């Protein structure tokens, strides 16, 4: 699927992009020929182009923007707050600067992408690439120059960081609280007052286990 700002783009160019929507090596962060073709078209049109790639290596969609922006849509193949979307985004910067912008990082976080990559393009050729992953409340980034130097091993970061998120989610799951009710009394009415404390604990939703009840008598 090709979407976005396709106005004025020749049919042959759209067909070339359409033909890129297929399966690639899942162990490659981005196929080199795919990247070269997208960079060439991005440079020729002076428009940002965005490519969505699944973990299986399939290009799911390609979006076209203008010289400075491209619309990002949500493509999520996985569910759960402790999971990433299962989709990574590689997009071009036809100004020749492959550094990720604040807007790029915001989209990475909002869409919970596997990764966000920006590729600098100068006269149809790639210059550099920056890749970012979600890590906790922040990001982990890698910079490559030239762009073709991008190490496919960074794909392992996706599963590693996602595993860290899952472990963190498990450790922060709400655990029912337990109350130890202790009443210090001087007038012998401890049992009545402890019953009142138990009622308050019940109102708060705390689980109770009744066994022996000990009263601490103040002198």
Give, region by region, the residue ranges found by the protein language model.
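N-terminal accessory targeting/assembly segments
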Residues: 1-219
